[in-house]
A protein has these predicted regions:
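Generic alpha-helical secondary structure signal
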Residues: 85-88, 92, 109, 113, ...
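Acidic/histidine-rich, metal-coordinating catalytic segments
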Residues: 64-83, 105, 155-160
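Hydrophobic (often cysteine-bearing) scaffold residues that line and stabilize catalytic clefts
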Residues: 26, 47, 51, 74, ...
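Basic, flexible linker segments flanking DNA-binding modules
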Residues: 1-7, 104, 158-167
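RNase H-like polynucleotidyl transferase catalytic core
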Residues: 69-77, 91-110, 126-131
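C-terminal domain-tail junction helix/linker
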Residues: 91-95, 117-178
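Mobile-element integrase/transposase regions
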Residues: 1-28, 53-57, 61-62, 68-70, ...
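Electropositive, glycine- and tryptophan-enriched low-complexity nucleic-acid-binding patches
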Residues: 31-42, 51-54, 60-61
Length: 178
């Protein structure tokens, strides 16, 4: 991968709401090159329609919706990603959907890494009493990750800053091997 918007990864991460004794879902899309979480869904359910929605919003956010530039979207074989709704959205949006083989999370390493970070630095440090609290805390953490979290692989810059440099200068300082 040599630039932004070539390969995006999408996956789910569960979180627990102790005060309500139930789980919530975080579905995130990451750009493999700049590590920006382009869009995400936080909810008490997580279905193919949610995956389709954040994919379309990601294309809008990256200003790709009215261009011919399209990333490949890589996922595992979760029910959200093999659903007719998501597959139809990929076709309608002209996005190639690549599914990794079962039991190979290393092939989705960048989104898995982000989900490990959010587990360690957000979920494990907070006991959520309500869905509202979980939603607020996770949203704030994602904002922190995108705008202030320093990545060694991004020359010690936060993803958003690195993204701006790449887009504004055309600088592509490295190749990401996937």
């Amino acid at each position: 991968i040599t630039n932004v918007n070539q390969l995006w990864e999408v996956d789910l991460k569960y979180g627990y709401i102790a005060g309500e004794d139930r789980f919530f879902y975080l579905m995130s899309i990451i750009d493999v090159y700049d590590r920006v979480i382009i869009d995400y869904h936080i909810g008490l359910t997580c279905e193919g329609r949610h995956a389709a929605h954040i994919l379309e919003r990601s294309l809008w956010k990256r200003k790709l919706i009215n261009t011919s530039t399209r990333p490949v979207i890589r996922s595992d074989n979760g029910p959200q990603f093999i659903s007719n709704v998501f597959e139809t959205a990929c076709k309608t949006l002209s996005v190639e959907h690549e599914r990794i083989p079962p039991k190979t999370p290393n092939l989705n390493a960048h989104i898995e890494s982000f989900h490990s970070i959010i587990e360690r630095d957000c979920y494990a440090k907070n006991e959520f009493n309500s869905y509202t609290e979980a939603h607020k805390t996770v949203t704030e953490f994602i904002d922190f990750y995108v705008n202030r979290y320093l990545h060694g692989s991004l020359k010690d810059m936060p993803p958003a800053e690195f993204h701006k440099i790449v887009v504004n200068t055309g600088l592509t300082p490295f190749i990401v091997r996937v």
